[in-house]
């Protein structure tokens, strides 16, 4: 398995060398998370900085490096990086003011994403065609929390 690293502008930085384990946790209704244990080489330390993005070759998901620790000792020279999948960017956005919506769940989710501070390079995929209707009002809420609530109540992942 190849772990590729990009900066926040999606410029390819390199490939992680000699990693011990990768826990890649997918979640259906909300962004997943990961934990990477790798050799503490100079190259890995340089690549695996907070804010950089990792992905498995061929995977649809990618994660943002958040917390990390370096473990050095006579028996170990290992780095640990943890983070959340890119969907977690929505949890960094607040829905300012009052928003009223009536339509399909899918259109409601898209509406919320379009009414927060723009996320550079964000592109929404094709519509899935869900026709289930919803009405909601939100004021000063976390966008990620609202998207998770809509996903759970509609069954859309």
Q: What positions do the PLM features span?
A:
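Catalytic micro-motifs at enzyme active sites that drive phosphoryl/nucleotidyl and oxygen chemistry
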Residues: 23-24, 67-72, 136
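Short coil-to-beta transition motif at edge beta-strands of beta-rich domains
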Residues: 44-56
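Short active-site-adjacent helix-start/loop capping segments
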Residues: 44-46, 63-64, 73-75, 89-92
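Juxtamembrane "anchor/assembly" segments of surface/extracellular structural proteins
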Residues: 1-47, 82-88
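Residues that flank catalytic or metal-binding motifs in active/ligand-binding sites
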Residues: 32, 79, 154
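Short beta-turn/strand-loop junction motif enriched in small, turn-promoting residues
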Residues: 41, 69-70, 155-156
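Short beta-strand and beta-hairpin "edge-sheet" elements
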Residues: 54-84
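Charged- and aromatic-enriched interaction segments used to assemble
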Residues: 84-157
């Amino acid at each position: 398995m190849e772990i590729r690293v990009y900066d926040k502008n999606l410029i390819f930085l390199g490939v992680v060398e000699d990693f011990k384990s990768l826990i890649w946790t997918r979640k259906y209704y909300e962004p997943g998370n990961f934990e990477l244990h790798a050799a503490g080489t100079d190259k890995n330390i340089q690549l695996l900085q907070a804010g950089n993005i990792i992905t498995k070759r061929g995977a649809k998901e990618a994660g943002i490096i958040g917390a990390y620790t370096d473990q050095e000792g006579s028996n170990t020279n290992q780095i640990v990086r943890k983070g959340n999948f890119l969907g977690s960017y929505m949890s960094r956005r607040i829905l300012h003011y009052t928003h009223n919506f009536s339509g399909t769940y899918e259109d409601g989710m898209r509406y919320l994403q379009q009414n927060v501070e723009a996320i550079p390079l964000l592109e929404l995929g094709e519509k899935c065609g869900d026709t289930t209707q919803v009405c909601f009002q939100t004021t000063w809420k976390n966008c990620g929390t609202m998207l998770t609530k809509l996903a759970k109540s509609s069954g859309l992942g």
